Amino acid sequence: MYRTMMKSKIHRAVVTEANLNYVGSITIDEAILNQVDILPNEKVQIVNNNNGARLETYVIAGERNSGTICLNGAAARLVQPGDTVIIIAYALLSQEELQSFHPKVAIMDESNRVKQMIEQEPPMTVL
């Protein structure tokens, strides 16, 4: 049996741009993607902390070290620049893979720089 598990998480990133006229997707700073092991074109879920909206799209790598978090296309209707979001990627893992698996979680600062990397979230934690 395979289980769908959180593989990667970018926690509390700040939206820098919402571009309605782009074809679609989310553009994320390439340096952030590398740290949490998310690839271009990988499917992600985005949770908007400001309004509760949840959506799925795919990733485009943005300029390295730019801090870019840009929602494109229809997704731009669900966010505003300055909103805080959580970006999550999932993986299908076998029981065997689960034994040694650790997700990568990046805790972001207000400038979209990785403040801290953790392998799992402590229970009942406010970050």
Curated annotation (Swiss-Prot):
Location of this chain's protein in the cell: Cytoplasm
Main subcellular location of this protein, as a coarse class: cytoplasm
Binding positions (substrate): 57, 73-75
Organism: Oceanobacillus iheyensis (strain DSM 14371 / CIP 107618 / JCM 11309 / KCTC 3954 / HTE831)
Post-translational modification: Is synthesized initially as an inactive proenzyme, which is activated by self-cleavage at a specific serine bond to produce a beta-subunit with a hydroxyl group at its C-terminus and an alpha-subunit with a pyruvoyl group at its N-terminus.
Lyase as UniProt keyword: yes
Key words of the record: Autocatalytic cleavage, Cytoplasm, Decarboxylase, Lyase, Pantothenate biosynthesis, Pyruvate, Schiff base, Zymogen
Gene responsible for this protein: panD
Top-level taxonomic group: Bacteria
Similarity annotation: Belongs to the PanD family.
GO CC terms, sorted: cytosol
Protein name stated in the entry: Aspartate 1-decarboxylase
